């Protein structure tokens, strides 16, 4: 039986640094709240992607099987508003910005997560989920046609945000409605207004509320109880509090065992957000800076603290990142293009132990980033003195251990290797689907297409053949 190192993380629910004990030994399942796809990603959206891409890589490095889900919210008030501005169907807005998301992820050189479900692919499951909450007495239909979750019926409400219900009623910003029994009650289903998209339901025409989608998609893909729910700390209340309430009310189980939240990115001390209009789009940033500059900038600060960002701060980071890149390039030149793999010595083992010890301590990436810079300085000294053993050791550690785990300073070959498994799997799936269509087994062919769509993979049959994205 494999022995795993003890990993400590800060759990928002308990308010303490705790040992991460998986629900199932050897496996860790994570749900990360994703973007509402009505605009381009900004640097604030990129922070959790960078953090949890690295966290996933670390868990895999020490031997865990990791399933990481990030959703797309593709039906929402903001999307409807954007569709009106552009005079487009709301579906087209969502599709466009999901495509732009993947372009930005490619430019960021971030690995795709295991599943990227879309809300609109889970409306039937959402309706069933709400019906069950209604049957159990946690939901009610209001006079305006909306269906609300009744907070007073759930005695554990406020546990995640560490607030009491009576305190929450005063001074907390929630969606106001005269039709609610309690100001804290939140919409599970919103009745459609004229000109808005809708789905048929037992409560009339409408669409899902914001909070219900994540509870449904996470439970459908990861099960009623999974290991970690993650996201920005601005989501703790009300979004994650509401997610947790409706999930536990429905299943009677604990939903996410642990909750991890990253701090915000600020411009001039203000939280960055599209709605505030003070955003720095990731695409524009990556035209000015290499993706490693942004990744190192974010990973050099602890994931839970807020980060102030400016072009000057990123320029300063760029200088140190370029020094590392130059030392790695010089090492490759020293060995005529390919640095030989070193023998596993005590030094090699010590560096690996430092990596694991640091990242097991509430994901202390700043210590690992600092060690990369230290190793790079030693690499430069070794290049000057032509110390071949140190050159090989430090190059390998930066490229293949520290860099590979954090997702920085990777070669093109390493980046391509990260994507090859999905491409190979999709080739097999499409070949199977083509064989089914040749046998006129269209129901099975459509089943594959529809279920791939649920996890964010779109299949299109064209005259030139079947394509996926």
Curated annotation (Swiss-Prot):
It holds the Pfam family tRNA-synt_1e. A motif ('HIGH' region) lies at residues 35-45. Keywords: Aminoacyl-tRNA synthetase, ATP-binding, Cytoplasm, Ligase, Metal-binding, Nucleotide-binding, Protein biosynthesis, Zinc. ATP binds at residue 274. Its cofactor is Zn(2+). Signal peptide: none annotated. Binds 1 zinc ion per subunit. The keyword Protein transport does not apply. Its EC number is 6.1.1.16. HAMAP family: Cys_tRNA_synth. This is Cysteine--tRNA ligase. It comes from Petrotoga mobilis (strain DSM 10674 / SJ95). The gene is cysS.
